[in-house]
Amino acid sequence: MAFVEKKLPADAPIAQKALGWVDSRFPLTKLWEDQWGKYYAPKNFNFFYLFGSLAALVLVIQIVTGIFLVMNYKPDAQLAFASVEYIMREVPWGWLVRYMHSTGASAFFIVVYLHMTRALLYGSYRKPRELIWLFGVAIFLCLMGEAFFGYLLPWGQMSYWGAQVIVNLFGAIPFIGPDLSLWIRGDYVVSDATLNRFFAFHVIAIPLVLLGLVVAHLIALHEVGSNNPDGIEVKDNLGPDGHGVDTIPSHPYYTTKDIFGVSVFLTIFSAVVFFAPEFGGYFLEYNNFIPADPLKTPSHIAPVWYFTPFYSILRAVTSQFMSALVLCTIAYAALIVFRTRLPQMIKNGVVGVAVVMVIGMLVFDAKFWGVVLMGVSVLILAGMPWLDHSPVKSIRYRPEWHKIVYAVFGTTFLVLGYLGVQAPTAIRTLVAQIGTLIYFGFFMLMPWWSAMGEFKPVPKRVTFQPH
């Protein structure tokens, strides 16, 4: 195809001529219009639809501040802690960059958790958005990996011993565990070798994967279109222009909304950075202001707050709790066999898996199954599109008691998070065990409870009140 220069009037502004020159060689304007400027989205977005753009903003903050931190950080066990102190005390505005990065880590998980909450409430994981959800879960897993690898870098007491505890968990895997832990650490204990490989993963490997997944997430979103609080497919009602009658272009409408949301977010973010960067020891643990000492274990080791719900599930699995897990496994297999219409071959497979699991629970210790449940508690999110059998997507049109189920699940998640930062006691362990059963019960029983009850009629068009 012959090259065609974009024609513009001779008196066109210089900026317009420059843009035309670029558009003739690179589809800049087309990309802008396809991805945002003329991307039509449902007109009834609410507060929950701010957090996707906020997550993108925080990702940019983390990348930019991370670049400046790496300029002065030394990934050496003898120099790492001192280099962080050097950044805080000697590098111009280094304290601000460090606090923005540490606050940004927690802010990232806050907006991502709220982003996922919106998806759960409005059924944004349902057909045809399964792939969007799967990319999102993969992004969440990458965020957890990125946070874990970065947690060791300050080389403080809590980061050192936290990494030691988490890596040692892999040692609970039968047969290959000890060798796997040694391979991950690169040494018999967390050392300079561990710090260097964690630094490489945190700075290069995981961010590259994360950026690729974010791009895939957005491409999948723009292919099938955005969901909305009513869970209605707006593409089913098209106007003469070929766009949904209940949609509006993202620019300028949602650009304005997002700018306002960003301004509020940055106000809160700045308040934390300038006035409470440690946030009571939750964003920056006080023990991490002490250099790592391999010979002195802290009295209580806990991960950062955004990992604590899953850490609580890990700690909840004790030898006494194994009997409850055995009973739950048998009961769930019986439920599938007697209360579903699945093919007999699948039922036989479920029984076989249940038998293997029960034998494994009797053979392997509780520590191994704690690690398994902690991993499954995250990975089970990927099954949401196929676990939810509700005839409607949005919580708005589900039975009222469904809202109670979601509220109990959310409260349980918060309670598990609180217990994860506390020292274990008999009562706290019992509460965590109950919370673990509720957490998994929410997902594993979803194929049944999500289809039960009296559902409200779903309107043909989105509900929208101008304001």
Regions picked out by a protein language model, each given a short descriptive name:
Residues 2-107, 111-467:
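Membrane-embedded and interfacial regions of multi-pass energy-transducing membrane proteins
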